[in-house]
Design a protein with these regions (language model features):
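Catalytic active-site module of serine/aspartate enzymes centered on a nucleophile-bearing elbow/loop
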Residues: 304-340
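Short beta-strand element of the alpha/beta-hydrolase
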Residues: 71-80
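Alpha/beta-hydrolase-fold enzymes
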Residues: 4-10, 140-246
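Conserved alpha/beta-hydrolase
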Residues: 86, 94-118
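Catalytic nucleophile-loop/oxyanion-hole region of alpha/beta-hydrolase
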Residues: 110-148
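Short beta-strand/loop motif that positions the catalytic acidic residue
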Residues: 268, 274-276, 280
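The serine-hydrolase catalytic nucleophile loop
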Residues: 83-95, 285-287
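N-terminal cap/lid segment of alpha/beta-hydrolase-fold proteins
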Residues: 26-68, 308, 312-318
């Protein structure tokens, strides 16, 4: 059985425990505050385009030239829905990795680096092939070094699926999954209720804008036209008309059920830390796994507060991005011990 950790919001003694910023424990404030405190990338990324076997590409944003840092421990970041290096959690963690002497990299999902992808496909929660190919390319190109993968939100569900599918064959030493929607169908309905509809509208606008750019650059590479795209009003509708159809699923519900990581979590073989907040406004309670469903190598941490990929502590004058210490601290055992 997995190790289950619950965090008491009234205690704080190490990075393993989360205490929200005083007066700012509200889930929506926690979710939105990172965009105030982590507006800009504070390092100069080294960009690289990786051509994929099917003729498409993904863009990589490194903390430094990987050819000059191939000996360093590696931390790979998989972002959330319509995320990128510019997402506060992504560049914040890469910077934290850099400060520890590790090589950090964000693998942008297809079409998420600012340029539309070429092929008749996009990315989704269960699309593990690109991440798997990249991790193996990383090892072939730069040799063996301790490697960890971190997935946020959609990228977290994807990473959980990948870990479950490949078991010990996946070339990573450990993984961390944050705010992942392990039950996609339940979360899709949750996003259509109450204040969560604000987040749905925001994400849907990003999805539609990205799809419109793809249609303009590569006409016919999506199963709907621009007029149909403009009429989409819900993420579930977007997934029904585009995500499911372009990737061979019957509809959005079929996609959600086949790509939800929850039923696969018991197959994870690598050391993995999963972090959720009870008050995550993107999530339904069904994303919280039962202890008996998790294998011993999975540690599950459920905090009272934190919102969706928020977890802001400290004070307004001195904010603390808890994930930027919690994740590297937990991974140190697997990255630095192996690199000695």
């Amino acid at each position: 059985m997995a190790q289950i950790t619950t965090t008491d919001a009234n205690e704080f003694s190490s990075s393993a425990e989360f205490t929200p910023m005083r007066g700012f424990s509200n889930c929506h404030l926690q979710t939105m505050l990172p965009r105030l405190f982590r507006r800009q990338v504070k390092f100069t990324p080294y960009w690289q385009r990786l051509e994929l076997p099917d003729g498409d590409f993904v863009d990589l944003a490194w903390s430094e030239d990987p050819a000059q840092a191939k000996h360093k421990p590696r931390l790979v970041v998989f972002h959330g829905l319509e995320g990128s290096l510019n997402s506060p959690y992504a560049h914040g963690l890469v910077e934290a990795a850099q400060k520890r002497g590790w090589l950090g990299v964000v693998m942008h999902f297809r079409g998420c680096s600012g340029e539309p992808n070429r092929m008749h496909r996009i990315y989704h929660s269960g699309e593990t092939e690109d991440a798997s190919w990249f991790l193996r390319w990383l090892q072939r190109e730069f040799g063996h070094a301790p490697t960890a993968a971190v997935g946020y939100s959609l990228g977290g569900d994807m990473l959980a699926c990948l870990l479950a599918k490949e078991g010990n064959d996946l070339p990573v030493d450990a993984a961390v999954i944050v705010s992942a929607p392990f039950m996609l169908e339940a979360c899709s309905y949750h996003m259509e209720k109450g204040f969560s509809r604000v987040y749905q509208r925001y994400l849907l606008n990003l999805l539609k804008a990205n799809a419109a750019r793809k249609l303009a650059a590569y006409p016919g590479t999506l199963p709907i036209n621009l007029a149909q795209l403009k009429s989409v009003r819900r993420i579930r509708e977007f997934d029904d008309l585009i995500t499911a159809r372009i990737h061979g699923y019957a509809d959005a519900i079929d996609y959600y059920r086949q790509c939800s990581a929850m039923p696969m979590l018991n197959r994870i073989a690598k050391p993995t830390l999963i972090i959720h907040a009870k008050d995550d406004p993107f999530m339904d309670h069904q994303v919280i796994p039962k202890p008996e469903s998790l294998p011993p190598q999975v540690e599950y941490q459920l905090t009272e507060h934190g919102g969706h990929v928020g977890f802001i502590g400290g004070t307004l004058l001195h904010p603390q991005m808890w994930l930027e210490s919690r994740i590297p601290d937990w991974l140190t055992t697997y990255l630095e011990a192996k690199s000695c």
